[in-house]
């Protein structure tokens, strides 16, 4: 996963830089989401991975998926990905692009994993604290993960704040076995 993200990051940065320059970040965002979904579709992915398909034919397949939404710039981007055998990275490129877009809009997407469902008040308190910490607007999504036992794990981009009982038990175990 980390390797795919490492490969996808330069493509996402280039796409975002171009889209920002052209004032078309939302159009690119929509196109990348559609392309990402197409690549994740098993039937379409199997069709794309046929050895007899040339990169140009792969790009034509995406043109059918996007229809009128495909600009020349998106077509050129797809050609670059196809020529370098990187079409499989589209989901990671789309995710990284969205993260860059959020950063540019001074917005941070945060995932809070909790052992138990959070009340609206708890969620609001966490959101306020995170907005102060990141000095940005925060968009929160909450996931319930009982395996954490207690506490929360907060993920914002590549930052992780792990205050779960599971993590504390693992640290204790490591110290005792050392």
Swiss-Prot record:
Keyword Metal-binding: no
Gene3D superfamilies xref list: N-terminal domain of the delta subunit of the F1F0-ATP synthase
A Pfam short name: OSCP
Localization: Cell inner membrane
Mode of membrane association: Peripheral membrane protein
UniProt keyword list: ATP synthesis, Cell inner membrane, Cell membrane, CF(1), Hydrogen ion transport, Ion transport, Membrane, Transport
Ribosomal protein keyword on record: no
GO MF annotation terms: proton-transporting ATP synthase activity, rotational mechanism
Main location: membrane
InterPro entries reported in the protein's UniProt record: ATP_synth_OSCP/delta_N_sf, ATPase_OSCP/d_CS, ATPase_OSCP/dsu
Positions of transmembrane segments: none
GO cellular component, one term: proton-transporting ATP synthase complex
NCBIfam families: ATP_synt_delta, PRK05758.2-2
Oligomer status and interactors: F-type ATPases have 2 components, F(1) - the catalytic core - and F(0) - the membrane proton channel. F(1) has five subunits: alpha(3), beta(3), gamma(1), delta(1), epsilon(1). F(0) has three main subunits: a(1), b(2) and c(10-14). The alpha and beta chains form an alternating ring which encloses part of the gamma chain. F(1) is attached to F(0) by a central stalk formed by the gamma and epsilon chains, while a peripheral stalk is formed by the delta and b chains.
The protein's role, per its UniProt record: F(1)F(0) ATP synthase produces ATP from ADP in the presence of a proton or sodium gradient. F-type ATPases consist of two structural domains, F(1) containing the extramembraneous catalytic core and F(0) containing the membrane proton channel, linked together by a central stalk and a peripheral stalk. During catalysis, ATP synthesis in the catalytic domain of F(1) is coupled via a rotary mechanism of the central stalk subunits to proton translocation. This protein is part of the stalk that links CF(0) to CF(1). It either transmits conformational changes from CF(0) to CF(1) or is implicated in proton conduction.
Family, similarity comment: Belongs to the ATPase delta chain family.
Protein name as annotated: ATP synthase subunit delta
Encoding gene, per UniProt annotation: atpH
